[in-house]
């Protein structure tokens, strides 16, 4: 009995000694947690710190001695772990402290951003660490003691608890690694710590630790994280290698567009079109100013306020042109700017906007162009930069619209505003469209293009006509006030839902055709009514229903004649033409209200009948499997053969090919 009592006393004494030895570690951990809380409270002294793979931004005015104090809790904890003779704990601690340190970095970067999951990770890991530290050493001691006393079964529950805690930490580590893999790709790889002073000069503080090449990294990560999945909103994106540089000179034509409360919603530029000053910006920027619009320009931010403006043109490619009163440019001190064609790929362009209240610029390269009047560009943008003109050699070559992915900023070409009086068919978009204007084009699955892609040519053609009327002296615009403008908010104006660029050809088996959007102010109720009426015939597969399918493209001569005319008659015809998934050039001209589309043309050949029937069948399918497509092909062939019996086997075989 006395033997067991003596053993119990020894065990209690050893537990007390171990607990006493661990007390300083608890204090160190509590001190580290309190220092983390103090950093959270003091947002002006936030620190982005890490080990060898991460970077550190030092607040302005921080010297080398005070920089060491930031790392003191981390160094003390690391020293304590190194003194322990536990290899597993050392390795696990080094990995965990790196993760916590990086989480602290992320939390400071995400200051003010709704990203609650990331903000909670440091607190969860600290709590888990404290539990592991409190349980690991007593459990290890009890396991060793129980193995000597043959009482291992008594401490088995403590082992299970320790294993569960360690597995929990490992689970958090794996989850966090996945998160940081995403964020790490968005950050710049630095080499040394830099302290930013006044102007654009930088002073080295601590060499070979980490670096920061821009003081706006917080804003960059903020915008990039916003671009990770807010569907339905206009997004911006920072571009690799394109930094924000503060400017002291205001470019020609540029204006900042503000709402009635003074908040910047986008940028734009003033330009003379057809002898009048016009404001050009993105359409989604203009619709934010229904209750009033303010224009500001210059480093000193001269401002003019308008209760309302006349919307001259709203295109289907997110562009908007408004009339401004005479003398607006002079009041703002804005100099005249010239519009030029979009340059070729790899040419350097610039964009301008505000970053944390400072007027900045960013440079990038022109990327691939699109047949949808668009092109990629590598200039970094922030929220509030939509509609900003894209400059090259002090000339506007496009307007920034939005991002089409994390590393894809999208601009709209203004080629249609350049040289309109010289020729109607000189730009590359017209030439691209003419290549597709082949009558009775055979359709053989699998298609190399989708009907959605073909519909976008139709939208661009209508947009081209609208742009042409701006340069016409005889055109009379029925301008709509900005406050009463009925914007089409039901769907994006001309952007793919899929993460592909507009010029990418998508298979018809992956994407179903969508309808066009109105050029002028669209009435939602009428648009929904017409869309439903236009889609009703697709439920049937009769020959009469085939008349409601898409009309084939006219030949090149007819297309040119239809696009060159621009006058009051064409304008009234364009305004009376409804927006439906079935483009029809034969809509009535005289009726002001929106009317249903015409039934289309009767097929004139076997190929045309086969094409119309096949498109109708594919468009009415819920899912397009290979079996359904084969049945649709057979039914379309039977339908075409019934209307046009083959007279010669040769012509029939050619048609089938």
Curated annotation (Swiss-Prot):
Residues 560-569 have a biased composition (Basic and acidic residues). Residues 239-434 form the Peptidase S39 domain. Keywords: Host membrane, Hydrolase, Membrane, Protease, Serine protease, Transmembrane, Transmembrane helix. The keyword Membrane applies. It is found in: Host membrane. InterPro entries: Peptidase_S1_PA (IPR009003), Peptidase_S1_PA_chymotrypsin (IPR043504), Peptidase_S39B_luteovirus (IPR000382). Pfam families: Peptidase_S39 (PF02122). This is Putative serine protease.
